[in-house]
Design a protein with these regions (language model features):
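Glycine-rich phosphate/dinucleotide-binding loop and adjoining beta-alpha-beta core of small-molecule
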Residues: 1-5, 45-216, 269-458, 531
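Positively charged, low-complexity intrinsically disordered leader regions
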Residues: 1-48, 205-242
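Glycine/serine-rich anion-binding loops at beta->alpha junctions
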Residues: 55-71, 241-244, 252-264, 268, ...
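Short pre-catalytic strand/loop immediately N-terminal to key active-site residues, enriched for Gly-Thr
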Residues: 20-27, 256, 425, 453-467
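Charged C-terminal helix
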Residues: 104, 285, 501-532
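Radical SAM [4Fe-4S] cluster-binding motif and immediate context
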Residues: 237-295
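Short, small-residue alpha-helix embedded
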Residues: 378, 465-496
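Short, well-structured alpha-helical segments that form the helix of a local strand-helix-strand
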Residues: 421-429, 486-500, 515-523
Length: 532
């Protein structure tokens, strides 16, 4: 597990390291500069004899940049130093770096030249930026991006200039980096779009800030790395049988919607409840699955027996929003005492029917919701409408009121969704006492009552294909059936799903991928994680 920090959390770590532990800020700055140069060398970026532009601001990020330029010059780079901003407002450390450079005979320009460079180090703004970029700073960023278009390698110091460290928002304009070297910990803006698209490759460098600098304020954000995967996967007993590794009951499929049922079911040992029209194709595609089909409405006793057999229920993929689906989901929510994953039409049914909403909120075990942005919007609208009606009777908690004050507010919240994702997702998790895996280009996972929030770093745009979410629901259900707790199942499921998508893209390319290719790539990912 790796931490993802907000700007104020990182600032607190810096301050405690300097003032509490006693490591001088200039030492940290020198360590930061060394880490950037090391990152460039590790990636075999040509440096000796190459023209490098250091674009520095007046804050400590600029000081880092000036120190980087000094080190690059020592290994043979032809360095041009450019300092943008009011020189009367230099930070103490940046002023010291300017003095060092002048003592060494370097010139520092106050205006960029139109030369072409082999490399640009972006050190204009760090994680403290909080307003729109205009004027000469905007011109400087545009020139850096132009250098990139001309073929220069762009390395951003800590975060690309112009990106909000907390949300990934662009403050008017931003540097498009090839590599970003983050100091000590990743920041939210590195992992959330659009900032993630501007970050390029992310390298997190140890500059000497210890975890003790958190004191008792442990960061809430975290993500996984590939090297952790083997430890995250549930163990397998050498004397286990087919029932040892979990049994999933899948409520999926409707007329002309058998595909979602098949895609979701490929990841696990399962029993499927689906309309009779899907029997033949499901049996052909998933011969391993146990199957119960029905005409009209499912038999209640048959559903109860299926629930007794299962360890986990997955409901929703392709099941439609008709009366039979409503009755089936209603019965399962009332009767099941299992962890439950609700996806796709299951989520739409929750948003449509107050009874289902109330049953979901009172579910006896773990409830995991996996909405894409459109489904999330419908759930938010339902939550805000419910909140408005409850407020009339003075029954709503203040915390939920603040998240969903009225039905009209849902539109405004979703308009500002990129900047308010964490608040919105946490609010929905609280409303339904659930785990919410909010699918997006950068999926987040939050749980009611839990401070931690998971930031997914795997996956790619080739996964934006019909059925991809059905595969995810099956993966999460399979992990939960093996005994993992709900939050860990959702986090690991999202990460594995993205890794499988990355593997499929590697083999087929983004344009050639289908959801079934993600399924086919899961064994490759698992084999790499557990090669023995």
């Amino acid at each position: 597990m790796k931490y993802v920090l907000k700007a104020d959390e990182m600032k607190a770590c810096d301050e405690y390291t300097i003032n509490g532990i006693g490591i001088p800020s200039m030492v940290l700055m020198e360590r930061a500069a060394l880490s950037v140069v090391s990152a460039l060398e590790e990636r075999k970026i040509p440096l000796k004899g190459k023209k490098a532009l250091i674009a520095a601001g007046t804050g400590n990020n600029g000081g880092d940049g000036l120190a980087i330029g000094r080190l690059l010059s020592r290994i043979g780079a032809e360095v041009t130093f450019y300092l943008e901003g009011n020189l009367q407002k230099l930070s103490v450390e940046t002023k010291a770096q300017v003095r060092i450079l002048k003592n060494m005979g370097f010139s520092i320009l106050s205006k960029t030249e139109d030369d072409e460079y082999d490399m640009v180090v972006d050190a204009l703004f760090g994680i403290g930026l909080s307003g729109e970029i205009t004027g000469s700073f905007k011109e400087a960023i545009e020139k850096i991006n132009r250098q990139k278009e001309w073929g220069a390698f762009v390395c951003s110091v800590d975060i690309p200039s112009g990106i909000c460290a907390d949300t990934g928002k662009i403050y008017g304009c931003a540097v498009k980096a090839d590599l970003t070297v983050a100091f000590a910990f990743a920041k939210r803006g590195h992992l959330l779009y659009p900032g993630r698209a501007y970050t390029g490759e992310l390298a997190v460098a140890d500059i000497g800030i210890p975890k003790a600098a958190f004191r008792e304020a442990i960061p809430s954000g975290f993500y996984y790395g590939k090297e952790e995967l083997s430890k995250l996967l549930p163990g397998r007993s050498p004397w286990g049988n087919k029932g040892t590794f979990g049994k999933v009951l899948l409520l999926a499929g409707s007329h002309d919607m058998s595909g979602a049922c098949i895609l979701c079911g490929k990841a696990v040992l399962l029993k499927i409840i689906t309309p009779a029209c899907n029997r033949e194709i499901v049996q052909q595609s998933l011969p391993e699955a146990l199957l119960y089909t029905f005409e009209g409405r499912p038999d209640e006793e048959a559903v109860k027996k299926a629930l007794l057999w299962a360890d986990v229920v997955v409901a929703g993929p392709g099941m439609g929003c008709g009366e039979a689906s409503y009755q089936l989901l209603s019965q399962v929510l009332e009767s099941a005492s299992h962890p439950m994953v609700i996806d796709a039409d299951g989520l739409n049914l929750l948003a449509m029917h107050r009874k289902l909403w109330e049953l979901a909120g009172g579910h006896k075990d773990t409830l995991i919701l996996t909405p894409h942005p459109g489904e999330l919007m419908r759930l938010i609208k339902a939550a805000s409408t419910e909140a408005a009606s409850m407020q009339a009777g003075h029954q709503r908690e203040a915390s939920v009121q603040s998240a969903y004050p009225q039905s009209e507010a849902s539109g405004a919240l979703m308009t500002e969704y990129p900047a308010n994702r964490e608040t919105i997702i946490r609010g929905l998790a609280k409303e339904l006492k659930a785990i919410v895996a909010a699918k997006d280009a950068a999926t987040l996972v939050a749980e009611d009552g839990r401070d931690e929030i998971f930031f997914n770093t795997s996956g790619n745009d080739g996964m934006a294909a019909a059925g991809s979410g059905d595969v995810l629901a099956g993966i999460i259900g399979g992990l939960a059936a093996q005994g993992m707790n709900g939050f860990e199942s959702a986090c690991l499921g999202v990460y594995l799903h993205g890794l499988a998508g990355d593997e499929a893209r590697r083999k087929l390319g983004a344009y050639g991928m289908l959801a079934g290719d993600i399924c086919e790539s899961i064994p490759d990912v698992m084999r790499k994680a557990s090669p023995v």
